[in-house]
Amino acid sequence: MTDRFQLVSPYSPAGDQPAAIDKLVANFEAGLAKQTLLGVTGSGKTYTIANVVQQVQRPTLVMAPNKTLAAQLYGEFKSFFPHNAVEYFVSYYDYYQPEAYVPSSDTFIEKDSSINEHIEQMRLSATKTLLSRRDSLVVATVSAIYGLGAPEDYLSLRLILSVGEHIDQRQLIRHLTDLQYTRNEFELTRGAFRVRGEVLDVFPAESDTEALRIELFDGDIEQLTLFDPLTGETLRKLQRYTVYPKTHYATTRERTLSAVDTIKEELKERLEQLYSQNKLVEAQRLAQRTQFDLEMMAEVGFCNGIENYSRHLTGKAPGEPPPTLFDYLPPDALLVIDESHVTIPQIGAMYKGDRSRKETLVEFGFRLPSALDNRPLRFEEWEARSPRSIYVSATPGPYEVRESAGEVTELVVRPTGLIDPVVEIRPVGTQVDDLMSEVHERIKLGDRVLVTTLTKRMAENLTEYLGEHGIRVRYLHSDIDTVERVEIIRDLRLGKFDVLVGINLLREGLDMPEVSLVAILDADKEGFLRSTGSLIQTIGRAARNLRGKAILYADKMTRSMQAAIDETDRRREKQVEYNLEHGITPKSVERPIADIMEGARDDAAEKKSGKGRSKSRHVAEETPDYRAMKPAEIAGKLKSLEQKMYQHAKDLEFEAAAQIRDQIQKLKAASLG
């Protein structure tokens, strides 16, 4: 393990990259707080940032506007820094229905959610890494501005173990339960521990492949060992190990009991207010709900919706911002805002939407006023907490340009020599028929096509129409979850279908070199989806292909269209000059089609885990290499195998059930590895 970033790449900076890297690093070292990197599609923005990270050697937080792009960036940074700690921090909810009240119909909607355990583990790993390593790079979404447990509590609760240290076994077990670990003697799962004589096995909450064995003798720690929880194979012996809490929201018993007292005081004040306003129903409701939560906290240290009491648990004053991922960052860190023209407005919008929903809950007696402090950061609070920053975008917004005070570094020349797509304008009247003929031409060449429409209805109708005419087409919309969205993009690249239709999901950062045509329907309808920035971003999706072309269907030239075409032409001219000067022949970008969540694999670790698992005896027949499968495929396969296993067991076909059980174990091992 090293505490220095080591960039691994088969190529060196070229084109505008060397000058951009030098300028960004020089500005950072000079103490410049904000700067902007204006990089066109395919110019190597991620690679440029990776070079900056290696040169400045600071812990780095990269913020992306959505989970799809965050996953892509995570994979790229994992491949650039295979020997360093690259982590992923996004919302761990697969499904989330927030608590809400609709006064007009007197409807209360209970909070309902489904947590993705794997992403929860990655979040815990990210915070542990930020607190313990300098060579940490975390890729996050706006989830980073939402409340977490205070880092002071998180650090004060950790359990530090050293070989030779004297520790009472009961005290050790009590400390693990304070960290919210659960005792499970039958199955060692993540966030659990088991006791066998003087041996304790702990599966750390932030780990997915390694568990810790603590061997005691006469009250002393005799040995600390990391082992594979699946096979029991010893991986390595340690002199020292730190066990971190199972959740970011863990807190001490004293803090919890203190919070109970302050919540009671707030409840008393709030009830007096409600009674004085003659709101008897609201007062009764609030007293009943809060008393129940207080009893749960006093007895078990936890209650449903405990995050609504986070102000009391962290000891913050009313109105103070909650602790977030930014509190885990060291003060000398680097912040990179990717696709800043989208991410920055997102950060500003989060607080307002959350506030309006919670004010209704407080007004009608569902929550105490302190629930308003369980919130994302306000924009000005986020600004105050942000370390030195680099805004990255092909179309920086006015905020980024203003904050950078003119320090805009351009990355216009592509090392591949690729020039920006040719932009053509065609009439709206025949747009669908014209599009079909263009699609057929591209399919003959083995290329892919992106089509953007203005409305969901139009996208659905167009998808149906193209499908009826024998074109393999899919429709990408907001109802599709993150993992499936990534799968659709991957299937497009693999050629499982040729045309992808969408509305606003085909813009920022998606890396699809196989796409040679982007069609923008109704391009002359001025608005958010057809602004200058949106048009430049959408046109840019075809910029990674040698035959890249963008067709704008419009009956009149709008100001946004003219500005987008002028900017595209400017970039084309600069690239053509560079190609002539350096004798470069443009060639399409070639990028392997892998699961973007996988990143780089550690070959040594893979061999080691493979070796260990081959020792264990299985009933299963030879099965395919599950490690080549994607997370969504693994999840689907697991579900199907489990159903078959239970059916065989029900039919008393135990050998068949045992074979499937072992396939499931291999599949789970592959998803962890």
From Swiss-Prot:
Region (Disordered): 600-628
GO CC terms: cytoplasm; excinuclease repair complex
Protein name as catalogued: UvrABC system protein B
Domain Helicase ATP-binding residues, every copy: 26-414
Listed Basic and acidic residues bias regions: 600-609, 618-628
Positions that bind ATP: G39, V40, T41, G42, S43, G44, K45, T46
Biological function: The UvrABC repair system catalyzes the recognition and processing of DNA lesions. A damage recognition complex composed of 2 UvrA and 2 UvrB subunits scans DNA for abnormalities. Upon binding of the UvrA(2)B(2) complex to a putative damaged site, the DNA wraps around one UvrB monomer. DNA wrap is dependent on ATP binding by UvrB and probably causes local melting of the DNA helix, facilitating insertion of UvrB beta-hairpin between the DNA strands. Then UvrB probes one DNA strand for the presence of a lesion.
Classification via InterPro entries: Helicase/UvrB_N (IPR006935), Helicase_ATP-bd (IPR014001), Helicase_C-like (IPR001650), P-loop_NTPase (IPR027417), UVR_dom (IPR001943), UVR_dom_sf (IPR036876), UvrB (IPR004807), UvrB_inter (IPR041471)
Residues covered by the Helicase C-terminal domain: 431-597
This protein's record includes keyword Lipid biosynthesis: no
Residues annotated as domain UVR: 635-670
Motif (Beta-hairpin): 92-115
SMART domains: DEXDc, HELICc
UniProt-annotated location(s): Cytoplasm
Key words, A-Z: ATP-binding, Cytoplasm, DNA damage, DNA excision, DNA repair, Excision nuclease, Nucleotide-binding, SOS response
GO molecular function, one term: ATP binding
Protein family (similarity comment): Belongs to the UvrB family.
Comment block on domains: The beta-hairpin motif is involved in DNA binding.
CDD domains per record: DEXHc_UvrB (cd17916), SF2_C_UvrB (cd18790)
Signal peptide location: none
Keyword DNA repair: yes
GO biological process: nucleotide-excision repair; SOS response
Subunit structure and binding partners: Forms a heterotetramer with UvrA during the search for lesions. Interacts with UvrC in an incision complex.
Pfam families tied to this protein: Helicase_C, ResIII, UVR, UvrB, UvrB_inter
